[in-house]
């Protein structure tokens, strides 16, 4: 009996979060269907979970950004500059595709906005003005109010200043970031319980139409990711290697993407990508740097998730968005996506930063994060699959282009 109890506790603490979230999702749907009155009473679980996310997210962004900048070391000289350019291009194009998809298929979300205060900007000038005001905000107020633009500004400034600090100071900051990340991991472990409360209460109050909205949102997200994987990325690779990119694209999706889909971790998929690069006889000095770098900053999937969910919230609140503001959202989403690997909740906990552009309160933004967690069983897997397969795809494209250039130069010299 004691052994079974220990096994159950181990499963709760160390078991697959995807499976646990799926169980919470199904349990919430069943409770709302069988006992709607009871389902409404468990809404406290969802409220507590969203509150915990709202409390930890500002501190997480601040300490992680500051730590990563303070502990940055100058990289060794390799051929990663063209790969880095492809990473940046791919991430930006992913944000553009997501924004375009959200405009073509605008989707509302079921959010509790009755008591929330909103101050939507009127145009791009107001957005930029608001961003500049938030940049120079008091850092304590920025943390208290969830002003992510101000948090980023202070974290970057302090990180740059601390690059000249003693190694012991940098080590302390790194340890602090690890500690905060551990706290976030604990909060995320409660996601199944929180989602159980959120789903059951939402369906009990709004009916099963709320689930249909989640399915539609998931379809838009996955469609944008498929467009990136099968259309935009091949075009980028073709621009680099000047020949049919699809054999390479499908090889990367098959060998790297499928594994990443189930591991749901770009970092965990690094050995898979390294082994694939080795089998393709790519330059070891290049892929040994570009693959870990890609796991950190190449976040096409995150660049899709952030604007799709942000614009879904914007549509729900009836905030008008013009083309310049949409382009600015693409840039902000691409920048946010590059930092998604350092966040335990992935891209979802960076959604409030994008939402702040439109005057959406932190309270509503965290409800959007909760919606993201509900669909996260598939969304996070697809996002990681796109992220990780693109790492090896762009690395292979640059290495092959470099080999072609060297071969061409040798032929020219012989002639």
UniProtKB/Swiss-Prot annotation:
Membrane topology term: Multi-pass membrane protein
One GO cellular component term: plasma membrane
Record keywords, A-Z: Amino-acid transport, Cell inner membrane, Cell membrane, Membrane, Symport, Transmembrane, Transmembrane helix, Transport
Catalytic reaction list: L-serine(in) + Na(+)(in) = L-serine(out) + Na(+)(out); L-threonine(in) + Na(+)(in) = L-threonine(out) + Na(+)(out)
GO molecular function: neutral L-amino acid:sodium symporter activity
Any one GO biological process: serine transport
Chief localisation class: membrane
Location(s) in or outside the cell: Cell inner membrane
InterPro entries on file: Na-dicarboxylate_symporter, Na:dicarbo_symporter_sf, Ser_Thr_transp_SstT
Transmembrane segments: 15-35, 45-65, 85-105, 142-162, 193-213, 217-237, 301-321, 331-351
PANTHER family: PROTON/GLUTAMATE-ASPARTATE SYMPORTER (PTHR42865), SERINE_THREONINE TRANSPORTER SSTT (PTHR42865:SF8)
Protein purpose: Involved in the import of serine and threonine into the cell, with the concomitant import of sodium (symport system).
Assigned protein family: Belongs to the dicarboxylate/amino acid:cation symporter (DAACS) (TC 2.A.23) family.
Protein name listed in UniProt: Serine/threonine transporter SstT
Species the sequence originates in: Photorhabdus laumondii subsp. laumondii (strain DSM 15139 / CIP 105565 / TT01)
Gene name linked to the record: sstT
């Amino acid at each position: 009996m004691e052994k079974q109890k220990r096994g159950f506790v181990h499963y709760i603490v160390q078991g697959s979060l995807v499976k646990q979230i799926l169980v919470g999702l199904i349990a919430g749907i069943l409770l709302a269907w069988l006992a709607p009155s009871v389902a409404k009473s468990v809404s406290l679980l969802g409220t507590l979970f969203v509150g915990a996310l709202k409390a930890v997210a500002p501190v997480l962004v601040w300490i992680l950004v500051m730590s990563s900048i303070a502990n940055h070391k100058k990289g060794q000289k390799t051929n990663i500059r063209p790969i880095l350019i492809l990473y940046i291009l791919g991430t930006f194009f992913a944000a553009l595709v997501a924004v375009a998809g959200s405009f073509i298929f605008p989707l509302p979300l079921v959010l509790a906005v009755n008591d929330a205060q909103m101050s939507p900007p009127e145009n791009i000038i107001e957005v930029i003005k608001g961003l500049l005001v938030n940049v120079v905000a008091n850092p304590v107020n920025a943390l208290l109010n969830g002003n992510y633009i101000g948090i980023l500004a202070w974290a970057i400034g302090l990180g740059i200043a601390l690059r000249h600090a003693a190694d012991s100071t940098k080590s302390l900051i790194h340890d602090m970031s690890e500690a905060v990340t551990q706290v976030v991991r604990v909060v995320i472990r409660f996601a199944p319980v929180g989602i159980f409360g959120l789903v059951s209460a939402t369906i009990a109050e709004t009916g099963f139409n709320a689930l249909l909205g989640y399915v539609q949102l998931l379809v838009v997200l996955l469609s944008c990711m498929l467009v990136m994987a099968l259309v935009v990325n091949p075009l980028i690779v073709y621009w680099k290697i000047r020949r049919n990119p699809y054999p390479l694209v499908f090889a990367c999706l098959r060998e790297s993407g499928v594994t990443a889909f189930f591991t749901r971790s770009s970092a965990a998929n690094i050995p898979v990508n390294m082994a694939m690069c080795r089998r393709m006889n790519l330059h070891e000095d290049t892929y040994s740097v570009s693959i870990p770098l890609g796991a950190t900053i190449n976040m096409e999937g995150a660049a899709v998730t952030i604007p799709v969910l942000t614009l879904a919230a914007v549509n729900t609140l009836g905030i008008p968005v013009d083309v310049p503001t949409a382009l600015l959202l693409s840039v902000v989403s691409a920048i946010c996506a590059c930092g998604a690997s350092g966040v335990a909740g992935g891209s979802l906990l960076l959604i409030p930063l994008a939402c702040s552009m439109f005057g959406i309160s932190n309270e509503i933004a965290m409800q959007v994060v909760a919606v993201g967690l509900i669909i996260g069983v598939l969304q996070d897997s697809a996002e990681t699959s796109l992220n990780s397969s693109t790492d090896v795809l762009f690395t292979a494209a640059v290495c092959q282009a470099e080999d072609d250039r060297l071969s061409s130069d040798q032929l020219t010299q012989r002639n």
